[in-house]
Regions:
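Zinc-dependent deaminase
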Residues: 1-19, 65, 81-147
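Immediate flanking context of iron-sulfur cluster ligation sites
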Residues: 64-76
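Short loop/turn microsegments at loop-to-beta-strand junctions
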Residues: 22-24, 70
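Short beta-strand scaffold segments in enzyme catalytic cores
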Residues: 24-32
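A short, polar/charged loop-to-alpha-helix boundary motif
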Residues: 41-55
Length: 147
């Protein structure tokens, strides 16, 4: 089931890619149903906070901001801002595709959702469909450098 939802997140990431955004996509699932889908819109919206995770959290929060019964699927390991937002939303679980060795905050640089200093902890699993997620990111940056 995880792979099915990560494939949807990858569809969102492709939308970002096609519109010149860093290709990150996110899907929030509750009880086996998709309740939110989003992709990066930082360039489009001229908003540094318009990361896929933030947009998906906002959509999903319309049914209530506590998301302990939700799983977030995202194509790239969340950054510090998004990891903090996931904690504040009390997300139940996070599954991500590619690791982010430079600013990933669910295991690569730091593990925000595993830190007992914060109120909410949640499991996070990385590497699902990692190859596909990483290749899309690499294609984006190769294209960007070529422009």
């Amino acid at each position: 089931m995880d792979k099915k939802f990560m494939a949807l997140a990858l569809e969102e990431a492709r939308k970002a890619f096609d519109s010149g955004e860093v290709p990150v996509g996110a899907v929030v699932v509750r009880d086996g149903q998709v309740v939110a889908r989003a992709h990066n819109l930082r360039e489009t919206d001229k908003d540094p906070l318009a990361h896929a995770e933030m947009l998906a959290i906002r959509q999903a929060a319309k049914d209530g901001w506590r998301m302990r019964d939700c799983t977030l699927y995202v194509t790239l390991e969340p950054c510090p801002m998004c990891a903090g937002a996931l904690s504040m939303a009390q997300i139940g679980r996070v599954v991500f595709g590619a690791f982010d060795e430079k600013q990933g905050c669910l295991g690569s640089v730091y593990h925000f959702l595993a830190d007992p200093a914060f109120y909410h902890q949640a499991p996070a699993e990385g590497g699902l469909m990692e190859k596909e997620c990483r290749e899309l990111m690499q294609r984006f940056f190769e294209r960007r450098r070529g422009d």
